[in-house]
Curated annotation (Swiss-Prot):
Cell wall formation. GO terms for biological process: cell division; cell wall organization; peptidoglycan biosynthetic process; regulation of cell shape. The lineage of its organism: Bacteria, Pseudomonadati, Pseudomonadota, Betaproteobacteria, Burkholderiales. The gene is murC. The keyword 4Fe-4S does not apply. InterPro entries: Mur-like_cat_sf, Mur_ligase_C, Mur_ligase_C_dom_sf, Mur_ligase_cen, Mur_ligase_N, MurCDEF_pg_biosynth, UDP-N-AcMur_Ala_ligase_MurC. This is UDP-N-acetylmuramate--L-alanine ligase. It comes from Burkholderia lata (strain ATCC 17760 / DSM 23089 / LMG 22485 / NCIMB 9086 / R18194 / 383). SUPFAM superfamilies: MurCD N-terminal domain, MurD-like peptide ligases, catalytic domain, MurD-like peptide ligases, peptide-binding domain. Disulfide bonds: none annotated. It is an enzyme of class 6 (ligase). One of its GO terms (molecular function) is UDP-N-acetylmuramate-L-alanine ligase activity. It catalyses: UDP-N-acetyl-alpha-D-muramate + L-alanine + ATP = UDP-N-acetyl-alpha-D-muramoyl-L-alanine + ADP + phosphate + H(+). HAMAP family: MurC. Its main location: cytoplasm.
Length: 465
């Protein structure tokens, strides 16, 4: 590719999916430019690495580019897309560019409705501990690396495979992971769950004859597609028929202690430096891959015990002063689907038994809120106190029956929690100052702009002091 394409431009370079690919390309020696609507830590990092960053979208930004990379979130009338089309500069989907990177190495693609980012991070960390020095492209910041991407010298590239727009069907990895299959992004599949499951089957058909599908048999929908997978399958999970399974699971001090049982191998005692049964499952996927690739048990144990997590995945911000005196524990999480939220809430209950749980939640997308409305009501009703914001639209038109006010009314009707509704995330710090008490566990949660709230909460409490 490099002898033809030397300058690659990214429209929306600050996004989680785009920035990782851009960083790897910079490190491969390509000239990289990109644009986004605002600066953030990601664009600053890319600029420091040598990428040319423009704030705002303008036709002039693509000057000299041999290819323009877009995600499905980029509109067709974007001025840079229009300019590329007028100049006959190839417009490349993000997943297609990721597929090109996978052609340079042996790809390990992590798919599933939930858990992709954490599982990808765990796989990359365990392989790195085993001396395989993988390249990785992750949808969140791997805290130990301080970045969401890295160019390694080893043979493998570990990356997330995105089913939300069916773009994972562009990838041809040698190892695939399927964590779970759930009803999300159903617009892509015509609101037909059978089509979604069929897409995952087609994903496994991208494997070569020597490849393998590493699948979580705890998920009933994953279990249903196994008979239709024509390539070798490695089953992991908590189920008795899992080839890589966890037993004797014990949650202590925010960590998960368990024993790994693998066919033909001695039991392996593991301490995972993360809470939650769902993270035990994610770790089992990494253990299955690492075992297959010859990583030593000592390296597996070390990597999982020292895993520092991923940005916005149960990320701890420490203790924050409470208005009534004392302090509360502040955690931030990316969860935005009811299944993910339930797993995070369960992890928090397990990590902090007996403590009051306060959730500040920003729903993400009106269509998701509409499609999962009852499930949102059910999961939000399980917390002890709730601050709820208006829906983060993500470019969608508002739906009056699926907005924050409608969700608040439904929650009050159920009567298990009385939400404090705020119009914007800017109001969350004030709301939390009134709600959070000494000894509470406070979680800010959502895939939108609420990710900036924890830093503001800390600043807010300092100003009040």
């Amino acid at each position: 590719m490099k002898h033809i394409v030397k300058h690659i431009h990214f429209v929306g370079i600050g996004g989680a999916g785009m920035s990782g690919i851009a960083e790897v390309l910079v490190n491969l020696g390509y000239e990289v430019s990109g644009s986004d609507l605002s600066r953030n830590a990601v664009t600053d990092r890319l600029q420091a690495l040598g990428a040319r960053i423009a704030i705002g979208h303008d036709a002039v930004n693509i000057e000299g580019a041999n290819a323009v990379v877009v995600s499905t979130a980029v509109r067709s009338d974007n001025p840079e897309v229009l300019a590329a089309r007028a100049k006959r500069v190839p417009i490349v989907q993000r997943a297609v560019m990721l597929a090109e990177l996978m052609r340079l190495k042996q790809g390990i693609a992590i798919a599933g409705t939930h858990g992709k980012t954490t599982t990808t991070s765990l796989v990359a960390s365990v392989l790195a501990a085993g001396g395989l020095d993988p390249t990785f492209v992750i949808g969140g910041r791997l805290i130990s690396a301080g970045a969401n991407a890295r160019l390694g010298t080893g043979d493998f590239i570990v990356a997330e495979a995105d089913e939300s727009d069916a773009s994972f069907l562009n990838l041809y990895p040698v190892i695939e992971v399927i964590t779970n299959i759930d009803a999300d992004h159903m617009d892509t599949y015509g609101h037909d769950f059978a089509r979604l499951k069929q897409a995952f089957i087609e994903f496994t058909q991208r494997l070569p004859f020597y490849g393998s599908a590493v699948v979580c048999v705890d998920d009933p929908n994953v279990r249903q597609i196994i008979p239709f997978i024509s390539k070798p399958v490695v089953r992991y999970g908590l189920s008795p028929d899992a080839q890589v399974r966890a037993e004797d699971i014990d949650a202590r001090d925010g960590r998960m202690h368990f024993t790994v049982i693998r066919d033909g191998r001695a039991p392996l005692a593991v301490v995972l430096n993360m809470p939650g049964l769902h993270n035990v499952q994610n770790a089992l996927a990494a253990i299955a891959i690492a075992t297959d690739l010859g990583v030593s048990d000592d390296a597996i144990q070390l990597a999982l015990a020292e895993f520092n997590g991923v940005g916005r995945r149960f990320q701890r911000y420490g203790e924050v002063p409470a208005a009534d005196g004392g302090q509360y524990t502040l955690i931030d999480d990316y969860g935005h689907h009811p299944v993910e939220m339930a797993a995070t809430i369960a992890a928090a209950r397990g990590a902090f038994p007996g403590r009051r749980l306060v959730l500040a939640f920003q729903p993400h997308r009106y269509t998701r809120t509409r499609d999962c409305f009852d499930d949102f009501v059910n999961v939000l009703s399980t917390v002890d106190a709730l601050v709820l914001t208006e829906v983060y639209a993500a470019g969608e038109a508002a739906i009056s029956t699926a907005n924050g006010d409608a969700l608040s009314r439904a929650l009050r009707t159920v009567g298990k929690v009385d939400p404090v509704f705020v119009a914007t995330v800017d109001d969350v710090p004030d709301a939390l100052a009134k709600v959070a008490q000494n000894g509470d566990v406070v979680i800010t949660m959502g895939a939108g702009s609420i990710g900036g709230v924890p830093a503001k909460v800390a600043q807010h409490t300092q100003q009040k002091a």
